[in-house]
Amino acid sequence: MTNLFKNIFIFVLSLFLLFSVSILIVLWTFSNSIPDYRFLKSYKPPVSSKMYSGNGELVADFSKEKRIFVPYEAIPKNVINSFLSAEDKNFFSHPGVDAKGVMRAIINNIQNIMSSKRLEGASTITQQVAKNFLLTNEVSFNRKIKEAILAFRIERSLSKERILELYLNQIYLGSGAYGVAAASL
């Protein structure tokens, strides 16, 4: 009986070590091709140039995108809470990737594939910032790994408030509007 437990323990330990080494190899491999994220600390999105008449009326708006930068402190709490509720309920408690969210999405997507329903994502707001600022929209496992690595690094480098500020000023909200302020006009 003791040999059985010993063999099971060795088997489980071997699986754990194999899994750990595999993860380290994947992380090391992808870390070499990760874009530099440090510019996000001081990033300000491009805003439109506006021309006003002598009496203060807007004459022209020169831009391809409608965009108005709003600092985190000026974004209404209801707007922040709405996005957190819809996009990333655990934003303030995860380290960039929400393990529970990933597991939920895997389970739900297996069920959705079986019933021909739409697949759901598990990207956190930080992962969306990584994708929108640093990666392409390519749908691939490689991009998701890079996105996760970047999310962990961004979370170590920036405050949660700064990450939300970037997200809420960069997200496309339709009709050419980028960011919550431009979308509110």
Feature-to-residue mapping (PLM):
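Juxtamembrane regions of bacterial inner-membrane/periplasmic proteins
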Residues: 1-185
